[in-house]
Amino acid sequence: MFAHTALRQRCAKWLLATGLFLLLGACVEKPSTLERVKEDGVLRVITRNSPATYFQDRNGETGFEYELVQHFADDLGVKLQIETADNLDELYDALGKPSGPVLAAAGLVSSERRKTQVRYSHPYLEVTPQVIYRNGRPRPTGAKGLVGKKIMVLKGSSHADQLAELKKQYPALQYEESDAVEVVDLLRMVDEGQIDLTLVDSNELAMNQVYFPNVRVAFDLGETRDQRWAVAAGEDNSLLNEINEYLDKAQKNGTLQRLKDRYYGHVDVLGYVGAYTFAQHLQQRLPKYEKHFKSYAKVEQVDWRLLAAIGYQESMWQPEVTSKTGVRGLMMLTQRTAQAMGVSNRLDPRQSIQGGAKYFMKIKEELDDSIKEPDRTWFALAAYNVGGGHLEDARTLAKREKLNPNKWLDVKKMLPRLAQKQWYRQTKYGYARGGEPVHFVANIRRYYDILTWVTQPQLEGQVAEGNLHVPGVNKDKPADKSSPM
């Protein structure tokens, strides 16, 4: 009897202890997603490798999505850790893994098929889905014209969803979804005639058009849509709420607009002929002078590709060019500037590049200290073209209009006014062809973007061997030189 009583007491104590342990365990709340990120000190993000999202150059990681999410990580006070997915299915699946990324920032458009997997953030970029065809082939003018065409799109994309809906209306419509390609590959396949059509978003086309000057927009397929970030559907609201607050703030404080201007504000300046010509000169002319650009860029501590872009804008990498106004050489130096920079022969490409590099950095160093990068570079380019005095006049006009005189996005709006009497009569330095520096900067930014992309470490071997696909090179020249749009 006594033994049974003792046993019951021991069991009761054990049950009580177990119950207390379970009760205490239940009282310890699981940290939220946001708390985990802050405790770890790392924001793990998955994206796509493309010019419009994320890629690496000699200076490190870059891209629209990368910069936007880097600002978010900075706001959280944590480090950013990026991984890339080979395809959209892999990207979405990674969000559901316990040790995987907590955020997808990859130019995503909300998709019905993904709603059980993820939840989407507030929008940050408006894009238009576009049907792309090759110049010289019949142009489809509407959805019915897609029937009978060889079409390929990214597997699991919103474009695949659109085609699936159209197939209900046009049962004969056929298309292929591929997880072995990226947008760049699809555009190349259209450019080379491997497929008839593809669907891409307008921002992706804008970033890649110059590499594939044969591609054209047939028509917009549907209304504009919003790009968003995504988090796993199973996560709590903490991180998504923080993301939405950040994106709303970025919209209001100008962060988003500055990034849009940096990555998309200059992408349509080349046109078809410019894209084709630049593609040729990239392989035929640049190699002759690349060592000089690199050498003097190192001396002046400037990116050699920026110097090369300036040289292309000035002379198309032709060392013996002379303008009607007397500027000469690869970097198109005036006699006065050449003398000041120690250049004795403006037609010597080595001396011209040396003088141009030195002059550009001199201008940049003389700018007001309140002008920060990347705007400082764009201001220096404008001053290189139009002169520092006229640039200051434009900054003064910007102040009067309650715009930011230290932001290129604002000052470039004022420069064209220097050609209008009602405005230039109010300035210190008077009339200037103010529209020219705006185009000058836009062109150089575009050339620089292309040079940055094609000189990625993983592509340099192909460039050196002449195997890199650059549109218009190693192919028959397209017959039509009309505008791409």
Swiss-Prot record:
Enzyme class: lyase
Start and end residues of each stretch annotated as LT domain: 268-485
Keywords: Cell outer membrane, Cell wall biogenesis/degradation, Lyase, Membrane, Signal
Regions of compositional bias (Basic and acidic residues) in chain numbering: 474-485
Membrane topology recorded in Swiss-Prot or TrEMBL: Peripheral membrane protein
Signal peptide: 1-29
Keyword Signal attached: yes
Primary localization class, coarse: membrane
GO terms under cellular component: cell outer membrane
PROSITE patterns on file: TRANSGLYCOSYLASE
Active site: E314
GO biological process terms held by the UniProt record: cell wall macromolecule catabolic process; cell wall organization; peptidoglycan catabolic process
Catalytic activity from the UniProt record: Exolytic cleavage of the (1->4)-beta-glycosidic linkage between N-acetylmuramic acid (MurNAc) and N-acetylglucosamine (GlcNAc) residues in peptidoglycan, from either the reducing or the non-reducing ends of the peptidoglycan chains, with concomitant formation of a 1,6-anhydrobond in the MurNAc residue
Subcellular location: Cell outer membrane
InterPro entries according to UniProt: Lysozyme-like_dom_sf (IPR023346), MltF (IPR023703), Solute-binding_3/MltF_N (IPR001638), Transglyc_AS (IPR000189), Transglycosylase_SLT_dom_1 (IPR008258)
Record region (Non-LT domain): 30-267
This enzyme's EC code(s): 4.2.2.n1
Region Disordered: start-end pairs: 465-485
UniProt-recorded Gene Ontology molecular function terms: peptidoglycan lytic transglycosylase activity
HAMAP family the record matches: MltF
Record comment regarding domains: The N-terminal domain does not have lytic activity and probably modulates enzymatic activity. The C-terminal domain is the catalytic active domain.
Function statement: Murein-degrading enzyme that degrades murein glycan strands and insoluble, high-molecular weight murein sacculi, with the concomitant formation of a 1,6-anhydromuramoyl product. Lytic transglycosylases (LTs) play an integral role in the metabolism of the peptidoglycan (PG) sacculus. Their lytic action creates space within the PG sacculus to allow for its expansion as well as for the insertion of various structures such as secretion systems and flagella.
Similarity section: In the N-terminal section; belongs to the bacterial solute-binding protein 3 family. In the C-terminal section; belongs to the transglycosylase Slt family.
Name assigned to this protein: Membrane-bound lytic murein transglycosylase F
